[in-house]
Amino acid sequence: MKQTIILLYGGRSAEREVSVLSAESVMRAVNYDRFTVKTFFISQSGDFIKTQEFSHAPGQEDRLMTNETIDWDKKVAPSAIYEEGAVVFPVLHGPMGEDGSVQGFLEVLKMPYVGCNILSSSLAMDKITTKRVLESAGIAQVPYVAIVEGDDVTAKIAEVEEKLAYPVFTKPSNMGSSVGISKSENQEELRPALELAFRYDSRVLVEQGVNAREIEVGLLGNYDVKSTLPGEVVKDVAFYDYDAKYIDNKITMDIPAKISDDVVAVMRQNAETAFRAIGGLGLSRCDFFYTDKGEIFLNELNTMPGFTQWSMYPLLWDNMGISYPELIERLVDLAKESFDKREAHLI
């Protein structure tokens, strides 16, 4: 009997379009000799819509439902995703997806799911909290100032100018895929950058700009996590924003990255240490800055990285000899393993 994968995609965050791309890639790459795929779309308003089922590879004409093609007659209660023995693959990016909220819902339903648990998902989603945890683990961070809604913005700007040097990057603490992030060269640019970031979150990070290469390491496993050789994001734009990353195709990837063996070893070790520090499970992508001065800063952990067949995370593992379909199978097996352990702890 085939194993059922419940594919959750869409979602309420600004990254829902990326989620659809990732989900369509997964549904086409699944080993249909072993799996059946059932898909549920989460609309922008948070409704669950039962969409397609696939017992064999979909045709090129098959497309997943989106906000533009919703069939509201297929709206179901969120708990309708439950199926005995099924594994959920929540291909959801950003808030209300990889921030622990969906993970908590799936644990209430007693369903195995791919990826990090409630704690590690919520922790890694918040940039300020992640920095504090990684600092405690001895991992170097880019200098920053945290600003919370209600703070005296003028005083905080003065703190930024005392502790950091322009240019600086302003980021919502709880957001991903470069949404709401701005680069500021002076105070006149910093004020509107803060206003933009506060549209997406009540906690904002102002980070020192660094002249650096962006290097990424893939992580796979539960308590025996393994890392990939690093890959590099090679940009044709000054700032790797949402449109550059997902829409304009203004980046290329260099896998493996052209860096020394010593730097590779440090990055892989730091990535594995960071994954353990947050209590990670299943998968993550660890993003580093490698400066022109030879400094290595861990920028962030992404607990549900972009998962299209052309995304960095699957390509990093392909370079290590694990194909995209095999990667999906391994993640499903890891989900079942962590579920069994979680259930055993409740006895």
From Swiss-Prot:
Binding annotation for ATP: 161-216
Cleavable signal peptide: none
Subcellular location(s) per record: Cytoplasm
UniProt-listed InterPro entries: ATP-grasp, ATP_grasp_subdomain_1, D-Ala_lig_Van_CS, D_ala_D_ala, Dala_Dala_lig_C, Dala_Dala_lig_N, PreATP-grasp_dom_sf
GO cellular component terms given for this protein: cytosol
Gene Ontology MF, one: D-alanine-D-alanine ligase activity
Binding site residues for Mg(2+) 2: E300, N302
Family the UniProt entry places it in: Belongs to the D-alanine--D-alanine ligase family.
Protein name (database record): D-alanine--D-alanine ligase
Gene: ddl
